[in-house]
């Protein structure tokens, strides 16, 4: 059995108002997986993944990255676990596409040659090379999402988390984003996609997990989990007899 890339152990997160967002989550991620994580609004999905690279601190319990607590290796965790937020524009930090992607590597104090190499490779991977001098806010929603992916790729992560990556995108933007996610998995990245839109992506997943009330309630192969999702307020793609391999917007 492969060692776990990521583990949560009795993970609890309680907000200052007493609301418990995570309620003792025990969960594992193995390198190379493509996980779809779904659940109703407020079930704890985004709070959970923000613990994976130390953006949040647990109230109790811990997150282990390759067997070591995330909070003992924060810089390494933030390089290893990349995250593309639901609002891609919130990740824009610079005045040009090139400088935006360069921001992360610059903070690693890499050489200018290495930074330039990473930026150009990352922009090429997401198809934005010809836009490197453009202002990020002039990009379309789909292009901004690809820019956020490029910024993550420049950090050379092992795992990439996408939080509702299809929200607010038109058909072309969804297809471009999904193509990018699938390609990243094929290139060896571990992928976790938070989404309500199972019909857009489930065909590519190796695992489907459902959260409710701060814990993982269902976890397994997509074909084993799918028939139970509506018990946890997740819409099952219709018709009910639809094959999982058809649940993609790629053709």
List PLM regions with ranges.
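The feature captures the beta-strand-to-loop junction immediately N-terminal to the Walker
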Residues: 38-40
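Helix-to-loop junction immediately C-terminal to a conserved catalytic motif
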Residues: 53
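Conserved ABC ATPase "signature" region
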Residues: 113-131
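ABC ATPase nucleotide-binding domains
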Residues: 227-251
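H-loop/switch region of ABC-family ATPase nucleotide-binding domains
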Residues: 195-196
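Conserved ABC transporter NBD signature motif
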Residues: 61-69, 77
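Conserved ABC ATPase signature
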Residues: 135-139, 143
């Amino acid at each position: 059995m492969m060692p776990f890339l990521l583990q949560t152990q009795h993970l609890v997160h309680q907000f200052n108002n007493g609301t418990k967002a995570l309620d003792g989550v025990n969960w594992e991620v193995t390198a190379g997986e493509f996980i779809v994580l779904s659940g109703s609004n407020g079930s704890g999905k985004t709070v959970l993944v923000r613990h994976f690279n130390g953006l949040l601190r647990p109230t109790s319990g811990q997150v282990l990255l390759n067997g070591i607590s995330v909070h003992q290796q924060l810089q390494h965790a933030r390089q290893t676990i990349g995250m593309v937020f639901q609002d891609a524009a919130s990740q824009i930090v610079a005045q040009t596409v090139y400088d935006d992607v360069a921001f992360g590597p610059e903070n690693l104090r890499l050489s200018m040659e290495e930074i330039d190499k990473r930026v150009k490779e990352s922009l090429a991977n997401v198809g934005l090379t010809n836009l490197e001098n453009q202002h990020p806010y002039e990009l379309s929603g789909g292009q901004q999402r690809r820019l956020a992916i490029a910024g993550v790729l420049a950090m050379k992560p092992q795992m990439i988390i996408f939080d509702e990556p299809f929200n607010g995108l038109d058909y072309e933007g969804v297809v471009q984003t999904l193509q990018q996610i699938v390609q990243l998995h094929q290139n060896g990245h571990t992928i976790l996609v938070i989404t309500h839109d199972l019909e857009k992506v489930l065909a590519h997943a190796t695992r489907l997990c459902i959260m409710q009330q701060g814990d993982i309630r269902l976890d397994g192969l997509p074909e084993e989990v799918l028939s139970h999702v509506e018990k946890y307020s997740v819409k099952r793609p219709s018709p009910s007899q639809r094959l999982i391999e058809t649940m993609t917007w790629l053709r």
